[in-house]
Design a protein with these regions (language model features):
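Long, low-complexity intrinsically disordered regions enriched in Ser/Thr/Pro/Gly
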Residues: 2-30, 38, 45-63, 78, ...
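N-terminal intrinsically disordered, low-complexity segments enriched in Ser/Pro/Thr/Gly
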Residues: 35, 92-96, 128
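Asp-box/WD-like beta-propeller blade repeats and closely related beta-sheet repeat scaffolds
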Residues: 122-126
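Solenoidal tandem-repeat scaffolds enriched in leucines and small polar residues
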Residues: 128-263
């Protein structure tokens, strides 16, 4: 594979200003979080990223795009009260997301459509902070049963926003709305409100810019107490800025100020309990654990400091807070925290101007690794036109196109000048950021979409320009297409169909007429073909978990087959829908309904299956679609046509003579890194996918933490490879082979059988206590890549801050003749989902073994045909690339080749030439960050 390492794309990751989990910490909840748990990440350009923790896997599901001069400075989630359904049962309330951004407006976001749902603004100052009222908890009666809410009691959550004019605005979220409730003002003095939190459902605590903390009763609107922090340090400002206030479960107030101090205040009389000086610069944010035993602070000195309660000496029941440790996980300010905890999960996420969210273990701090989440988007904002050697990238409201020249083909050839050149640039009008952009495979059509509009451009090379500059001209787009925006756009490989995924996840297709001569323009037909997805049953959600509505049906990816005759889409719920293009005269549409409802919707069906220039799109097996996958669909890609013959013999002895056509095989990569290949026309698994379940994947691949971003195909007469890549890794699988091979699998089965018989014999012969080495070996064998409390894996003892192991040997008796291994750490309860996964994995292994045996017996003497040749490498991987923005293919057969070139010779050369790609990197050390605090020794 020929690789061009490119760092010329000036993509600028934006600072993280706000973090918020959709659910509050709950130590009484088992497992690693509820299914609806999400993390919202607010950035300085107005984008909001929605991350799914996935019990430690961390997957970026979608991005809510911002706009010009917009910023996210605060994020909160609320849960609406449950409603009573028609059947009398309670239905889960909706989870709602709100944001502020240095304006007088609070914005509610529509997660299903990916754009703002409503705004609330008023005659008050700019909002600097935002907090949500704690969720309503039912009181228990004498029989320990929950009591209903009192008459007239509001069980929802109000919002409190602190403003620059000193006021605190209360907003009501009742009745699925956002309305002004009241304003809290301390006095005639108007200091900025820098931080706000709730001590309980009726008490509000706010930090100001005048060295004070004020406590309000939101029911009466009265000021209960003003807490003074005193003067600032000598040589600095007289007034302290209270950047953060948080409350422990017992009501204790914790504050962080511009002097770098963390102070603890009594919950009842609001007196100072303790003050700690742990930062060299401002303390910007504070995080507290669910049990109130751990506090974290982040500052402008890049430090993350951990405090824990230290019990007094014997006879002293009082406890004091002490700094346990501090460390620099960020290269810039630590600006914001978000905490989530259950019985099995305990994490805190931090962020700042260095753009990378950092996941830290909270309960197991010092015993587990931290983890840096990617700062780059997980849907690559880069597309290429291989034949034209054009690379397109977009960010904010800008699109840039580069031309990558060919490298030297031999050691004696001298490269001529610059290897890349900027040949085109587009700045779109309006305020919305670009949601999606694509370049056709021939490099002649450019499509740019925002949340409110779609623009189509023709791309041509300027005549007489030796530099290869492009002429980008806007085309007349019909109103049926441009009047609404899109979350995804793509162009078919033959450049005849434009696919649009609307913000509400409706799929539309428009016919494109390419220009037949240089004097003509490419035309986009006004008629839209609306495609319907198969109806799927929604997953049941518990009332306490809340619901995200139709957010799970958000389309993650959409792709055409290589002959442009099949279209496939995948969504966050794991559903895959497919459609095929057929001649209108030969297509007969089956009406699923035969009652009166069918007559009413007949006109809609005709529009959905309307013919365009004699062709019609229809769903494939709408009555029995492809089964839903276990996790979200991360990638979809059709297998390209292989130049090899259909009777190719696999190197592990399996005949491919009966395999399905390569044009219809669809590869799906899930967020759990499961590779599933379907026949798109028949809706069944391919033979390769049947023989290779996820349990057979290499252990190194299953241990990869960053999720896959994209894939490339490398097909020729001698190889069938798929290349997967993430932010920091690149992996190759040879699809002509199974992994592990049949011989290796038989050896594993025999070894497992021998181990089982040996263990049974040992149990019958003697019973002994397990040694420490046996116990450690079992622990290492049982650990999974995403084990732990949600951050990184277990820290080795030599790198741990705890300085003692998690196990010790306890001796019984005066002569120490009996010993027992005792665990010093708290044993976490077993996760039921992990037990189910292990059970399903064992079933998949047994089923795959049977399929391989059947394939081997059906292939006859095929083993003898390949026994003389050495099998090629089944997989390969590397971690040498950092900050991968995307990897795009390039073609050695360019559109600029002379017309006299022999087509057959070119086809033979391209079939035998290796894959050529451009690896676009954007490491953080190449990004210009704002000024930061400089320490004395720097």
């Amino acid at each position: 594979m020929d690789i061009h390492r490119c760092r010329f794309v000036p993509y600028n990751p934006q600072a993280i200003n706000a973090l918020a989990f959709s659910h509050p910490p709950s130590l009484g909840l088992g497992g690693k979080g509820v299914p609806t748990l999400r993390l919202a990440v607010g950035r300085a350009n107005g984008d909001i990223e929605i991350w799914n923790p996935m019990r430690g896997a961390w997957f970026q599901e979608t991005v809510l795009r911002g706009g010009k001069d917009r910023s996210i400075e605060g994020l909160v989630w609320t849960l609406d009260p449950p409603e009573t359904g028609p059947d009398g049962q309670q239905q889960a309330g909706r989870l709602r997301l709100f944001s502020i951004g240095y304006s007088t407006t609070v914005t509610e976001w529509d997660l299903e459509q990916g754009r703002p749902k409503r705004h609330s603004s008023g005659n008050y100052g700019e909002m600097w902070c935002l907090a949500a009222q704690p969720r309503w908890q039912a009181a228990t009666g004498k029989d320990n049963k929950p009591l209903p809410a009192a008459e007239g009691e509001y069980t929802g959550q109000h919002l409190a926003a602190g403003c620059a004019d000193g006021s605190i605005v209360l907003l009501s979220t009742a009745d699925d709305d956002l309305k002004f409730l009241k304003t809290l003002r301390p006095s005639t003095k108007r200091p900025r409100v820098l931080s706000v939190t709730f001590q309980n459902r009726h008490t509000l605590v706010a930090g100001y810019a005048d060295s004070s903390i004020r406590v309000f009763d939101i029911r009466s609107g009265q000021l209960k107490r003003t807490i003074s922090l005193g003067k600032g340090p000598t040589g600095g400002s007289k007034e302290l800025l209270v950047w953060s206030v948080k409350c422990l479960p017992d009501g204790t107030i914790v504050s962080g100020d511009s002097a770098g101090e963390v102070r603890f205040w009594d919950a009842k009389n609001y007196s100072l309990i303790q003050r700690l000086q742990s930062h060299l610069a401002d303390t910007l944010d504070i995080a507290v654990s669910a049990d109130g035993e751990t506090v974290l602070s982040g500052g402008a000195d890049q430090r993350t400091v951990v405090y824990r309660k230290k019990s007094g000496e014997k006879g002293d029941k009082s406890s004091r807070w002490a700094e346990v440790t501090h460390r620099r996980y960020h290269t810039h300010d630590v600006k914001t925290f978000a905490v989530y905890e259950t019985k099995n999960l305990s994490i805190v996420v931090s962020g700042g101007p260095d753009a990378s969210p950092v996941v830290l273990p909270l309960r197991e701090f010092g015993k587990e690794h931290h983890r840096n989440l990617p700062s780059l988007p997980q849907v690559p904002p880069v597309v290429s036109s291989p034949s034209s050697r054009l690379v397109m990238s977009f960010w904010d409201r800008e699109v840039s196109i580069w031309r990558v020249s060919r490298g030297p083909t031999s050691l004696h050839e001298v490269p001529d000048g610059q290897r890349h050149r900027l040949v085109g640039k587009v700045m779109i009008q309006g305020e919305e950021n670009i949601t999606s952009a694509t370049l056709s495979s021939d490099g002649k059509i450019l499509v740019i979409a925002t949340v409110s509009s779609i623009k189509v451009f023709s791309v041509r090379r300027r005549k007489g320009d030796d530099r290869g500059t492009l002429r980008i001209q806007k085309l007349d787009t019909p109103e049926t297409i441009s009047e609404d925006g899109a979350r995804l756009v793509t162009v078919s490989p033959d450049s005849r169909w434009l696919c649009i995924v609307r913000p509400n996840n409706d799929i539309c297709l428009a016919r494109v007429k390419p220009a037949s001569s240089p004097q003509e323009k490419t035309q986009v037909m006004p008629q839209l073909v609306n495609l319907r997805r198969a109806v799927r049953h929604a997953r049941f959600e518990k009332v306490s978990h809340g619901t995200l509505g139709g957010y799970e049906r958000t389309i993650r990816c959409i792709v055409f087959s290589h002959n442009s005759n099949i279209l496939a889409s995948g969504d966050l719920s794991g559903c895959i829908d497919t459609w095929t293009l057929e001649d209108a005269e030969q297509t007969t549409i089956k009406k699923p309904n035969t009652n009166a409802d069918a007559d009413e919707s007949s006109s809609e069906d005709e529009d959905d299956y309307a013919a365009v220039e004699g062709q019609r799109w229809r769903p494939i097996a709408s009555d029995s679609p492809i089964p839903r996958l276990k996790s979200s669909v991360a990638l979809l890609s059709f297998r390209p046509p292989s130049p090899a013959q259909s009777n190719t013999i696999l190197t592990n002895g399996t005949s491919a003579s009966k395999t399905i056509s390569a044009e219809t095989r669809l590869m799906a990569i899930t967020t759990e890194h499961q590779l599933v290949e379907f026949d798109a026309l028949q809706g069944k698994l391919s033979e390769w996918s049947r023989r290779n379940p996820r349990a057979f994947l290499p252990a190194d691949f299953k241990g990869v933490r960053d999720r896959a971003m994209g894939c490339l195909w490398d097909f020729s007469d001698s190889r069938e490879r798929i290349w997967l890549y993430g932010t920091s890794w690149l992996w190759m699988f040879d699809l002509r082979q199974d992994f592990p091979s049949t011989e290796e699998l038989n050896e594993v089965v025999a070894a497992e059988a021998n181990d089982a018989s040996d263990q049974q014999t040992q149990k019958q012969s003697q019973k002994r206590k397990r040694s420490a080495q046996d116990q450690d070996d079992d622990d290492k064998r049982k650990k999974k890549p995403n084990s732990g409390t949600g951050a990184g894996g277990q820290l080795p003892l030599a790198q741990s801050d705890v300085f003692f192991d998690s196990k010790a040997r306890a001796f019984v008796g005066p002569d120490a003749s009996q010993g027992e291994i005792v665990s010093l750490g708290k044993e976490r309860p077993v996760d039921e989902e992990e037990e189910d996964e292990e059970f399903n994995e064992n079933n998949e292994i047994q089923l795959a073994r049977v399929r391989r045996e059947n394939a081997k017996s059906g292939s006859g003497d095929s083993n003898q045909l390949v026994s003389t040749s050495t099998p090629a490498r089944r997989w390969w991987f590397t971690y040498k690339y950092r900050g991968i923005l995307g990897i795009v293919p390039l073609s050695s057969k360019s559109a600029d080749l002379d017309a006299d070139t022999d087509a057959d010779a070119d086809g033979e050369a391209s079939a035998n030439t290796g894959l050529e790609v451009a690896v676009i990197e954007r490491p953080m050390w190449d990004v210009d960050l704002p000024d930061r605090y400089v320490r004395e020794y720097e």
